[in-house]
C-alpha cells in the first residue's frame, strides 16, 4: 500500500463513520486514534480548502517516494506546496527538500502550532484554515 495514492471522502464526518471512530477516542487522545489522525487532518484541510473554492488541488509524490506533498495549489500564477501535520511535530523532510531546491516558492503548513512565518514557509494553525 505504500505506492497507493491518498483517497479523500466528501466529508470528514463520513470518513470518521467509515473507520468507526469513537468520539471519546478523539477527545482523550487515545493511541488507537493515532493510526489515522494524519489522514483525518488532511481530510479536514482539504474539505476547508474546497469549501473556500480552492481548485484544483493536487497531490504530488516522486516515483521513489522521497518527495511527497500533501497538497499543491496554484495561487496568483504561483505553485504553493502545502504540508499538513496533525500535531506540533512539524518535521517535513519533503517540504524542506523542495524549498531547498526551489527557494522562490512559498509554502504553507497547517498544524497545531501558532501562526509563524519562517522564511519561505508560513505555518497556519489548523483552526485558521
Predicted features along the sequence, with ranges:
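Accessory nucleic acid-recognition modules appended to NTPase machines
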Residues: 1-68, 73-76
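Short beta-alpha junctions and helix-cap segments that line functional grooves
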Residues: 68-69, 82, 94-95
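Short catalytic-loop micro-motif centered on adjacent basic/acidic residues
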Residues: 58, 81-84
Amino acid at each position: 500500500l505504500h505506492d497507493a495514492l491518498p483517497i479523500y471522502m466528501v466529508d470528514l464526518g463520513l470518513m470518521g463513520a467509515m473507520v468507526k471512530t469513537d468520539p471519546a477516542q478523539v477527545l482523550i487522545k487515545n493511541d488507537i486514534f493515532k493510526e489515522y489522525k494524519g489522514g483525518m487532518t488532511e481530510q479536514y484541510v482539504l474539505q476547508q480548502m474546497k469549501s473556500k473554492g480552492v481548485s484544483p488541488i493536487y497531490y504530488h509524490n516522486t516515483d521513489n517516494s522521497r518527495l511527497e506533498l500533501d497538497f499543491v495549489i496554484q495561487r496568483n500564477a504561483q505553485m504553493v506546496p502545502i504540508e499538513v501535520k496533525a500535531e506540533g511535530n512539524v518535521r517535513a523532510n519533503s517540504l524542506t527538500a523542495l524549498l531547498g531546491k526551489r527557494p522562490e516558492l512559498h509554502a504553507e503548513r497547517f498544524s497545531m502550532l501558532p501562526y509563524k512565518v519562517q522564511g519561505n514557509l508560513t505555518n497556519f494553525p489548523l483552526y485558521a484554515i
